Amino acid sequence: LEKALIALAAALAVGIPALATAYAQAKIGSAGAGTVAEKPETSGIMIILEAIPETMVILGFVVAIMLILQFA
């Protein structure tokens, strides 16, 4: 039972930030498409803004690995 709870915690540590990242990237992507259509010189900034929410998933993955390694 303990290993199942650790696996659940690790899955939630990655899954919840992944859902939040998907929502944020959808909003940023749609706004970015409109911005780049009007001002093409902002494409570099929009790529950076699109990548920023990915840090949530990366940090969630790190937390999941730490959970698995600490209790395994």
List PLM regions with ranges.
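Hydrophobic, small-residue-rich transmembrane alpha-helices and their short perimembrane loops
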Residues: 1-72
